[in-house]
């Protein structure tokens, strides 16, 4: 049995933490400084983690490699199993042009460009985040806004800032699923706390968006529908993440936000010509004026309706218990690890939820979607294989980063860093979202930041007497605010609207909002760690 040691380097916690942090530092420097491709940076960091575990911590090489293999397998199933199937559903709607029908349907909710920004970037973007993630919401929302006549820079900035509130539950809950796994905390517990943090951002972001579109006038004239949209989004995200399913949080929130905009009379008032003239300075696409049969509009919404129904049914206690029976649990081969206290760690056992996992439920929704929107079985299979091919580098990135995280967690590297960081004491609650923000700003992924920093956040929380669930959630909630400034997302936004090479211009425009909202999140977490806002936690 391998027993984790907290101070393997010269008996010093500080030196040990410095060595333990090397894999993380290497990944972040390669991504943010050298601008190396993410999958190569992940593999390099994994190699560093293996060497540190073996040479500095004395973990047997066989167990080190086995822990990395477990992380890679978890990356494939359930994480990438969810992502692949969700993106597959999206690709089928694109192939049949039902995606175009859906975006035209959203675009017709109002002719006011400020409301259109909310509908497309905030609500429709959240719907895309729920299924596709990985930069797709920013690219597609920005292109749609340009097609409406938005100036490219304004469209890109709006799309970037809007892609915040839904990120923690994106790709059918992938970030929080990863966070729960690497920390050993129950998914429901982690998701419920995240669902009491990011909805507070959702209250603010729509107001920020109308300001970005039309300044003080936009805020003065459209604050009522913007606030209604934010409140509906926040309530739905909170309710889904706490009482239904984390995987449904973004879908429910997106539809609720759009529904609120439809329900508020002020959102349907035509914009003054002076507003349209000052905001819509680009060229409008004629494609947006096409008329779609009501039957096809219903079919365009069908994939999302099917996902909501299937996930909701899966949460009914008898059904949930029946699905859970197929879960396979077994001791992971060549792995026998104990914590510093000599007790076996949870990582020795691997759980494989074959049927109840979100990816399998999305696969079922995808099969039904293919039938509803008229995709032949052979074409559906080709699209699924094409999805895997499209994600090949993302697959390598996710598996390498999760392998790295598992090596660090099981060797004791994460525990060492966590004990060292715990010295921050009460200030840890303020710094916790900053760590997640930094991780996403560099990696471009809330999932990666949760995999890298989730375990050390929990260790630090336990050592400092704070709630592990609170700091784990803060890592993800703070991380969503780093996405708008990540080089990956800036590049995607620039490419989508034809601003190649102008990432710096976008960064200067979104950085103040990223930092300002991060400060708000830090204060929320500090408040939740004290009696001031502690009542908000479950």
How would you describe each model-predicted region?
Residues 77-79, 90-97, 127-137, 165-172, ...:
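Short helix-coil transition sites and intra-membrane helix breaks within transmembrane domains
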Residues 112-143, 147, 167, 395-407, ...:
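Hydrophobic alpha-helical transmembrane segments of multi-pass integral membrane proteins
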Residues 290-435:
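Transmembrane helical segments that form the transport core of multi-pass membrane transport proteins
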Residues 15-16, 27-63, 84-96, 264-270, ...:
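Structural signal for alpha-helical transmembrane segments and their membrane-water exit/capping regions
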Residues 168, 172-278, 477-538:
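Juxtamembrane and boundary regions of transmembrane helices in multi-pass small-molecule transporters
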Residues 8-22, 75-79, 131-137, 188-203, ...:
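Structural signature of hydrophobic alpha-helical transmembrane segments
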Residues 238-326:
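Active-site loops and adjacent core secondary-structure elements that bind or stabilize anionic groups
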Residues 114-126, 152-165, 188-206, 399-400, ...:
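Alpha-helical transmembrane segments of multi-pass membrane proteins
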